[in-house]
């Protein structure tokens, strides 16, 4: 769907590997099971006719907001090995949002903001893409900053709501090594 590896597919990969299955990120071949995920409704579904599978499972918010990964998969750490071309980590410190913008599906999909346990980082990563929808609305934002500082990696924050940021948060935001501009 975009410039990032698909987190759901990475967790599905870990789940299957933990259960003794062989996992490939496939563009060609015959498989027992094929997973297809898309984040956005407008994303084209490019079903490659060079892939055949006994079972095909499609999912993601681009298909149906009400369907979620089963808990036994959701709790798995991401398997970055299926995306060797990415040299960064994805991270969430919160899910959901305090806003309910009419153009956005986050509140419908994830509910109100809540802190979540950080995921394992990409062992080959050199920066962290923090994908929280509203980083400083997280009641545990300071723990998130501490965690980011402890990694000594550059950070790209994707959700900073300048309408709610206070002086203390601005101070700690300035302590991070930023990879790019902060996304507001």
Question: Model-flagged regions — what are they?
Answer:
Residues 1-58, 63-64:
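A short, structured N-terminal alpha-helical element that caps or precedes a catalytic domain
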Residues 2-3, 39-43, 62-65, 97-99, ...:
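Short, solvent-exposed loop/turn segments at secondary-structure junctions
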Residues 8, 84-124:
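Canonical Radical SAM [4Fe-4S] cluster-binding loop centered on the CxxxCxxC motif
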Residues 16, 97, 101, 130, ...:
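Conserved, mostly hydrophobic/aromatic
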Residues 31-35, 102, 126-128, 180:
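Conserved acidic residues
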Residues 34, 46, 65-72, 83, ...:
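Short, charged, surface-exposed secondary-structure boundary motifs
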Residues 55-81:
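Ser/Thr/Gly-rich flexible loops in soluble cytosolic domains mediating phosphotransfer, phosphorylation
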Residues 123-184:
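Conserved SAM/AdoMet-binding glycine-rich loop
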């Amino acid at each position: 769907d975009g410039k990032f590896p698909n987190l759901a597919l990475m967790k599905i990969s870990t789940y299957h590997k933990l259960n003794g299955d062989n996992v490939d990120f496939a563009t060609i071949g015959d498989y027992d099971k094929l997973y297809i995920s898309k984040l956005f409704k407008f994303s084209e579904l490019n079903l490659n006719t060079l892939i055949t599978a006994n079972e095909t499972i499609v999912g993601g918010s681009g298909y149906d907001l009400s369907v979620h990964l089963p808990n036994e998969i959701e709790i798995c750490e991401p398997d970055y090995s299926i995306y060797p071309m990415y040299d960064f980590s994805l991270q969430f410190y919160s899910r959901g949002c305090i806003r309910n913008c009419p153009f956005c599906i986050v509140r419908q999909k994830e509910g109100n903001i809540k802190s979540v346990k950080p995921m394992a980082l990409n062992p080959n990563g050199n920066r962290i893409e923090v994908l929280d929808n509203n980083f400083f609305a997280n009641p545990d934002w300071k723990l998130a900053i501490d965690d980011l500082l402890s990694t000594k990696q550059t950070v790209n924050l994707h959700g900073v709501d300048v309408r709610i940021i206070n002086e203390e948060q601005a101070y700690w935001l300035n302590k991070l090594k930023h990879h790019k501009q902060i996304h507001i």
